[in-house]
Amino acid sequence: MKKWLAVALAAVLLLTGCAPKFEKNKEVVQKTDDKTEKAFIPNYQISNKYYRTILPFKPSKTRGMVVANLNSRYDIKEFETGLMRIAKSEYSPEKYLFQEGQILDKKTVSLWLNRKYTAKQLKDEGLEASDNIGLNPLDDEKGSIDDRNKKNPIYLAHVLEQDYLVKTDKDTVKLGGVMIGLALNSVHYYQKEKYGATYERKIPHKELKAEGEKIAAEVARRLRGMSELKGIPVTIALFEQESKSSVVPGNFFEYATVDANSSSLNAWEPVKEKYYLFPDTTSEKDHRDDWTFFMNFKQDVEKYFSSNGVIGRGFYKDDQLTDLRIEIPIQFYGEAEAIGFTQYVAGLIMDNFPDYISIEVNITSVNGPEALIEKKPKEKEPYVHIYK
């Protein structure tokens, strides 16, 4: 399906005069501190909005850790793609190539995610003194388990590295910049006994921000001490992940850069991005007009089929709704019914929402995906695909 959509997208771009750049594969040499490797730059670039990756693809040295450390699939996806969005402000896709992190390995990140330890705790954990590099606060083991977790929650959930390569001459690329994402917990989960009930300690944003900035400063210091990053600019971004029960992802809220010849962070820059669930009391309170658009759409859908499962996830940038993804679970009893309903929904999209919003509607049944509807900003007609 992804391959089919890619072909369809290419066709649309060609028809609208915005064709992707189709160039020959470019063989280059990738230089690191201790070796050189041959690599290829892909010949297709769909848009200047996306980074090219060099081939063969190198998976991150911390591959798989993000799945275990973040609360939901929504957070996992947004943590990676959101960091790439921020990267564009520092490393242009027209100049830089993307590569998954090759400097921080699993052992390093695992140790960073630990708490600080006392000498006794180190011994109990079977760790050496050199391993006592955790970025989360010490548990002094004073007071009840509740008191200890409320006093010193786990703030840092994960560290994500993204590398951005730049051409140094016609046939050579090297590391040009690094993005580091720090995933921070908005809720700290703990247990009073093994396999016991799970308890929560909510972490206010102000507290999260302050602790995140302290952690970022220490991460910047450590990164600058690595030989691989000598003279390389590093940007660190703070991500507030949502609770385990949330059906929308968290968001990055600020970032700062360590210049190539510096070991300290520049001033923090705000990131004005946020996801909202529709319908929901928070979206109703913060974005009443958009909430009304969605509710009118939902009510019109339910005139055709009674469904309480119509939900939307809206992405806001600078307090403006830019993307809305809608899920409609429906039980169909025939293909004609599915086609008719899809056409009806496509019309509702055009009637109910402003034309500056990018909209994606996924219609599903117990059998899986039934139809996809996409409407890009300013387009006169939506793209519709009915799965066979």
Feature map (PLM): residue ranges:
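N-terminal Sec/ER secretory leader and immediately downstream segment
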Residues: E27-K174
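Short, non-transmembrane amphipathic alpha-helical segments
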Residues: R201-E228, A336-S358
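Sec-dependent signal peptide recognition
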Residues: K2-A8
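Intrinsically disordered, low-complexity segments enriched in Gly and acidic/Ser/Thr residues
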Residues: L277-D355
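C-terminal motif of bacterial Sec signal peptides marking the signal peptidase cleavage site
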Residues: L13-G17
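Polar/charged, Gly/Pro-rich intrinsically disordered segments
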Residues: E240-H287, S306-S307, F315-Q320, N362-K388
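Bacterial signal peptide processing site
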Residues: A19-F22
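Short edge beta-strands and adjacent turn/loop segments
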Residues: P153-H188, F305-I330
